[in-house]
Curated annotation (Swiss-Prot):
Subcellular location per the Swiss-Prot or TrEMBL entry: Cytoplasm; Mitochondrion inner membrane
Sequence positions bearing N-acetylalanine: A2
Presence of the UniProt keyword Mitochondrion in the record: yes
Stated name of the protein: L-lactate dehydrogenase B chain
Subunit record text: Homotetramer. Interacts with PTEN upstream reading frame protein MP31; the interaction leads to inhibition of mitochondrial lactate dehydrogenase activity, preventing conversion of lactate to pyruvate in mitochondria.
Gene: LDHB
Bilayer topology annotation: Peripheral membrane protein
Length: 334
């Protein structure tokens, strides 16, 4: 007796298990992981989304909640499991998992605890998707990108930190607000370490090719009567303010990560400020990861743009590199 499905649907091609073309995995289904997931789904970037976490109930609930939105999405398969076999054949894996900083905890201690988490996660990712590109989002992102690179054994063009992509987006938004234009028409770069010691490249800030520093030579300095330096200060403080107000940040970082993924999956060769291995650049001698303008395409992070930086900007980058190395050199089990 034929089933309803057999009566309804007459097959033309043989059924086969298909390997997904553009599978994306998100590791960690906390606020940031789920913001990444919904941003990826909203841009229709993937034909299969896999979620992984250690909290099974939360994981299943998030998966079901997204699956129930399938009618409104163009992603035919959404899966989740605590077992990493669910991530097999991923093109891109986004790592948002990690432990949170406790009150009064040193960064070194926080990093070491996250190293212990990553020692489990990273080998599993590489086991099931040996050809993937890994995007690290967990903080402190520059150090954990280095940790991921070391643990994964992947070439450096396939291990990328979300880095200053969000810092630069915040910078362009705040500048554009002051000027009354859209952020996409206000060009500016935040480089270096994601967060407190990031570097604003004032010499490169422009609108329609007009250098703003040529109009106001004091821009970004302490002598500036218009106090544009405050914009960079606001970029650095904005995450803390959002955390103070709502407890965490998630939407902007989720959108920022989807933006990076789009450049890679669509082979766009767009340029983003993301965290990459900078040894040998700007006189940096250690294996540290910092954000520089990088070309992202289907192969991963394929090139770095040589920006003309001023001496004090290079000095700031070197200082960040030294700070990061100071923590990295004491990490155990890498």
């Amino acid at each position: 007796m034929a089933t309803l499905k057999e009566k309804l649907i007459a097959p033309v091609a043989e059924e086969e298990t298909r390997i997904p073309n553009n599978k994306i995995t998100v590791v960690g289904v906390g606020q940031v992981g789920m913001a990444c997931a919904i941003s990826i789904l909203g841009k229709s970037l993937t034909d299969e989304l896999a979620l992984v976490d250690v909290l099974e109930d939360k994981l299943k609930g998030e998966m079901m909640d997204l699956q129930h939105g399938s009618l409104f999405l163009q992603t035919p398969k959404i899966v989740a499991d605590k077992d990493y076999s669910v991530t097999a054949n991923s093109k891109i894996v986004v790592v948002t998992a990690g432990v949170r900083q406790q009150e009064g905890e040193s960064r070194l201690n926080l990093v070491q605890r996250n190293v212990n988490v990553f020692k489990f996660i990273i080998p599993q990712i590489v086991k099931y998707s040996p050809d993937c590109i890994i995007i690290v989002v967990s903080n402190p992102v520059d150090i954990l990108t280095y940790v991921t690179w070391k643990l994964s054994g992947l070439p450096k063009h396939r291990v990328i930190g979300s880095g200053c992509n969000l810092d630069s987006a915040r910078f362009r938004y705040l500048m554009a607000e002051k000027l009354g234009i859209h952020p996409s028409s206000c060009h500016g770069w935040i480089l270096g370490e994601h967060g407190d010691s990031s570097v604003a490249v004032w010499s490169g800030v422009n609108v329609a090719g007009v250098s703003l520093q040529e109009l106001n030579p004091e821009m970004g300095t302490d002598n500036d009567s218009e106090n544009w330096k405050e914009v960079h200060k606001m970029v650095v403080e904005s995450a803390y303010e959002v955390i103070k107000l709502k407890g965490y940040t998630n939407w902007a970082i989720g959108l920022s990560v989807a933006d990076l993924i789009e450049s890679m999956l669509k082979n766009l060769s767009r340029i983003h400020p993301v965290s990459t291995m900078v040894k040998g650049m700007y006189g940096i001698e250690n294996e540290v990861f910092l954000s520089l303008p990088c070309i992202l395409n289907a192969r991963g992070l394929t090139s770095v743009i040589n920006q003309k930086l001023k001496d004090e900007e290079v000095a700031q980058l070197k200082k960040s590199a030294d700070t990061l190395w100071g923590i990295q050199k004491d990490l155990k089990d890498l």
